[in-house]
């Protein structure tokens, strides 16, 4: 199953004020964003002050589980919904932000993001990839890991992208490698050839 991170869309609460968080030293940290409705999907995180390039914005928190546990909890195809609160940390560990998660789970995907995810020491952080103005929605490229089961229909359907960027690739799945693109093009060519032969044979009979 493509690993993802779910955004709830059933209810649309009022915009939240920036939330205060305590660091490990006990100091109070005010997050540089607030959560409110987003045009991309459900709710999103919006900057409440200018954010400098390279600034560490927030840590992505949640329950740390195995891939097997995550797959048992969520089935994208069965539910007809990709679950975007799951974040792959390694081959063994996934963070499920539906359990003990924080506001980081509301940061939406974009094919032209202003943030990036960084894994350090088994922890996941969201950093600013470029200067961000007040009021701008924070985004990063989910680039969901492909497991080979995704179809072409899944790309724009189940895993379709609505970021609206000029460079939008139409899916939140990771870009296909050049080799995979060549295999897909060859398969499409074979399907077209078979369909042409079938149509011609049918006409002759």
Question: Where would I find each of the regions flagged by the language model?
Answer:
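Intrinsic structural disorder
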Residues: 1-5, 26-29, 51, 205
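C-terminal SET catalytic tail plus cysteine-rich post-SET Zn-binding segment of SAM-dependent SET-domain
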Residues: 2-6, 11, 16, 111, ...
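Catalytic cores of histone-lysine modification enzymes
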Residues: 25-118
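Low-complexity intrinsically disordered segments
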Residues: 20-22
């Amino acid at each position: 199953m493509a690993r993802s991170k779910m955004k709830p869309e059933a209810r649309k609460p009022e915009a939240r004020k920036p939330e205060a968080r305590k660091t490990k030293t006990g100091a109070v940290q005010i997050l540089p964003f607030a959560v409110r409705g987003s045009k991309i999907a459900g709710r999103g995180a919006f900057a409440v002050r200018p954010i400098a390039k390279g600034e560490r914005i927030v840590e992505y928190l949640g329950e740390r589980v195995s891939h097997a546990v995550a797959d048992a909890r969520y089935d994208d195809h069965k539910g007809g919904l990709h679950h975007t609160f799951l974040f792959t940390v390694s081959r063994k560990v996934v963070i499920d932000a539906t359990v003990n998660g924080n506001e980081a789970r509301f940061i939406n995907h974009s094919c032209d993001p202003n943030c990036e995810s960084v894994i350090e020491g088994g922890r996941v952080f969201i950093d600013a990839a470029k200067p961000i103005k007040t009021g701008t929605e924070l985004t990063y490229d989910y680039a969901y890991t492909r497991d080979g089961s995704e179809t072409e229909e899944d790309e724009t359907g189940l895993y379709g992208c609505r970021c609206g960027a000029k460079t939008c690739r139409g899916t939140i799945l990771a870009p296909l490698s050049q080799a995979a693109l060549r295999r897909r093009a060859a398969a499409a060519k074979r399907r077209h050839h078979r369909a042409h032969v079938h149509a011609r044979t049918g006409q002759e009979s």
